[in-house]
Amino acid sequence: MSRPQKLAIGLIKGYQVAISPFFPSTCRFYPTCSEYAVQAIGKYGLMRGGLRAVRRVLRCHPFSPGGYDPA
């Protein structure tokens, strides 16, 4: 895993620990969008995995059916 990938994953993990607990869980998918981002970046690399994570976050809204959506 490259250094930029590790940095991006570290930032997401930091968000999960420091910021996310203060807000109610609203993600419509499993795994959550932030966990999906970690998995996608680890599996596909920073650029391709990051793009997949952005698309996933854009699909996560109140009108989305959600459900199981693995990376």
Swiss-Prot record:
Subcellular localization: Cell membrane
Membrane topology annotation: Peripheral membrane protein
Gene Ontology CC entries for this record: plasma membrane
Keywords: Cell membrane, Membrane
InterPro entries reported in the protein's UniProt record: Membr_insert_effic_factor_YidD
Pfam families in UniProt: YidD
Main location: membrane
Superkingdom, taxonomy of origin: Bacteria
Coiled-coil features, chain-numbered ranges: none
Family: Belongs to the UPF0161 family.
Task of the protein: Could be involved in insertion of integral membrane proteins into the membrane.
Protein name as catalogued: Putative membrane protein insertion efficiency factor
Organism: Desulforudis audaxviator (strain MP104C)
The organism's taxonomic lineage, starting at the top: Bacteria, Bacillati, Bacillota, Clostridia, Thermoanaerobacterales
